[in-house]
Amino acid sequence: MTTKNVTDENFESEVLKADKPTLVDFWAEWCGPCKQIGPILEEISNEMRSEVVIAKHNIDDHPNQSTKYGVRGIPTMLLFKGGELKATKVGATTKSNIVSWI
């Protein structure tokens, strides 16, 4: 399993109504730190697929959700459980930090 791309249009069905906790990575193509954590999130997605969904949301292509959730810098990771925002992490970090944060 790889990370899932989410858009403004499918955010509710793919994130808010998900049956598992969902980590959403708000990112952009031009963002260097976003490119750093991309492969890390792919690894986590593969290793923890039974526990959590890892989703990516491109803020340039789909700006509505980033505005709604007050994303001001990227990468920003938001963790949703049961349709509610539970935690926020801003900036690139290590795999072990992301896993323990989840």
Regions found by a protein language model. Give the residues of each.
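Non-catalytic, surface beta->alpha helical segment in thiol-disulfide oxidoreductase systems
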Residues: 73, 78-102
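Conserved redox-active cysteine motifs that mediate thiol-disulfide chemistry
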Residues: 26-40
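A short beta-strand-turn-helix
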Residues: 4-22, 63
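Structural microenvironment flanking redox-active thiols in thiol-disulfide oxidoreductases
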Residues: 59-65
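Conserved helix-turn-beta segment immediately C-terminal to the redox Cys motif
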Residues: 19-21, 36-57
